[in-house]
C-alpha cells in the first residue's frame, strides 16, 4: 500500500482524503504527517487541515488534472511501477559550449502541448540545436501563462500534457540526441493557488518584485530547503531532464554559511554520479557575480553556467542603437569589444541605471567563457518590452544576422529564443489567465501603470488576460520557409554548423579572443584563431582591414588583398591565409 506523507508543522490536525474517504494521519516530531492507505494508482487525494473542510492539494503533488485549486492525483514515474522509459541509451552531455533553444510549450506550436512540440524536434536537430530549454512547466493557476507564477512546483502543467506528456517529450528529445533543460522557479510562489503557508513556514518576510520570498534561512527553513532541492533533483531523476535553468537566483535571500545554491550544486553532482550522466545547472542572475560559477574548492557555488545580460546588452545596443533604461551604459563599439573580451561590462564599475557600482571581475584565466550564456534575445528581453516586439520587428535581416554571428561565433555557450532563427513576426507578450476577477484586474492595471511611467498610452499595452494576447504569440511556422525568413533561417543553420565544425570556434578561453573595431566606420572584427568575423554595423558600405578565404557571409563582400568591403548591415566570416 502506498504511504502518504506531508510536512505540515503549522496545523494541529492533518487528515488524508482519498477519493472522498477520510483517513487519520500520525504526526512525527519533525512536523511530518504520514499514513499508509490502500489507493488506486490514479487516486485523487488531498489533505484536510484542522477543522477546515476544504481538501487542499499535496505540496509535492505530481499531477493536478483539474488545476492547482483541486485535488492531486497519484502518479509514478515510468520505469518504477509502469512502462519502461525509452531513453535508457542516452549518455547525456555537458551544456558548456552547446547551442540551447529556449521555448514556451504553449506558444511553440498551435496546439501548445508537449506532443505537438515533439513534431518540431527534427526541425531543431536540422538547425543544429544541442539542448531544448523549456520555460517553466510546473503547475500554475489558469490555462495560459509564462509559468513563472507556479504554486505546485512538483507537478506538470496539465494543459501542456501533464507529467506523462513531459516524459514523452524528454524521451523523444533524447532519441534525437537533444538534451533537455527545465526552467525552475524557486524564488517566489504565484498569487493564485498557493496553499503552502497553510502547511508550514514556507515564506519569509523578505519580498522580491514577484511576491513574498521563500524561507531558506529563517526558523524551520531546513525542510523548505529540502523542498527546493528535492524538487530540483526530481526533474532530473524522475523525468530524466539534463539540467535546470534557475530563475532569478539573486532573489534567493540566504544568509546561512552554505548558500542553498551551493547545496543544490553539491546534490546535483551527487545525482550525476548516481545516474552516470552529466547534469547541468544554469543560473539566471543580474549581479555579474562569478562566484556562482566558480568551483567550491575556490570559494564558489559550483553552478555550471549563468545567463549574461551584459553580452546581450552590448550586442543589442551596438546593432539597434537603443539606449533606454538599463541599456544606458552600452551602445558603443568600445563597450561591445570590452564585453566580448571580458565576459562582463560591469565588473565593479559604476552603473548609471543602478546608480552604484555593479558586478565583479571574471578571472578569464580560470573560468572558461562556456560558463556564461550569450544570446540575442530571450523571453525576458522580448516579453518585458511594452509590446513584446522581437528584434525582427524593428531591425533589418542584416542586423539580425550580425547579432547572430557575434553570439554564435563567440566562445560563450549560445542560446536562441524560439523563432529568432527565421526572424519570427509574432511577438512574445506577457499573458496570463488568472481565474480570480480581482487578481486579473490588478494584473492588467499594474501592467498598464508600469509602462505609463515610460510614456506608453494605456490602450497601447496588450491586455495579458485577453486570450488573443496569448494567441498572437504563437509561432507562425509557415513563414519559416518563405522569403527573407527562409534566408535568415539558412544563415542561422550554416552559422551553427560552422560553430560545431570549426575547432577555432570551440576554444573557450577569452584570453585567446581578439576584437578590433572602428567607432566612426562602424565595423567590428572578432578574431577566433584563423577565423575572422567581420561586421559592418553601419548604414553605409565600409572597408574592413582584413582579408582571407570567404567562409560565410550576409550579402556579397568584395575581398581584396588586404581589406574587405562590406555592404551596409552585413558581415563576412573569413579564414586567414596560412603563413607561407
UniProtKB/Swiss-Prot annotation:
The protein's Enzyme Commission number: 3.2.1.141
Primary residence: cytoplasm
Residues that coordinate or bind substrate: 245-250, 309-313, 379-384
Pfam families: Alpha-amylase, DUF3459
Top-rank taxon: Bacteria
Site feature location: Transition state stabilizer: 380
Bias-annotated ranges (Basic and acidic residues): 60-69
Cystine connections: none
Disordered: region residues: 56-88
Spans through the membrane: none
Inactivation phenotype: Inactivation of treZ does not affect the production of both capsular alpha-D-glucan and glycogen. Cells lacking this gene are not affected in their multiplication or persistence in the BALB/c mouse infection model.
Pathway: Glycan biosynthesis; trehalose biosynthesis
Recorded catalytic activity of this chain's protein: hydrolysis of (1->4)-alpha-D-glucosidic linkage in 4-alpha-D-[(1->4)-alpha-D-glucanosyl]n trehalose to yield trehalose and (1->4)-alpha-D-glucan
Subcellular location(s) per record: Cytoplasm
InterPro entries referenced in this protein's UniProt entry, alphabetically: DUF3459 (IPR022567), Glyco_hydro_13_cat_dom (IPR006047), Glycoside_hydrolase_SF (IPR017853), Ig-like_fold (IPR013783), Ig_E-set (IPR014756), Trehalose_TreZ (IPR012768), Trehalose_TreZ_E-set_sf (IPR044901)
Function as written in the Swiss-Prot or TrEMBL entry: Is involved in the biosynthesis of trehalose but not in that of capsular glucan and glycogen.
Sequence similarity: Belongs to the glycosyl hydrolase 13 family.
Protein name as catalogued: Malto-oligosyltrehalose trehalohydrolase
Organism: Mycobacterium tuberculosis (strain ATCC 25618 / H37Rv)
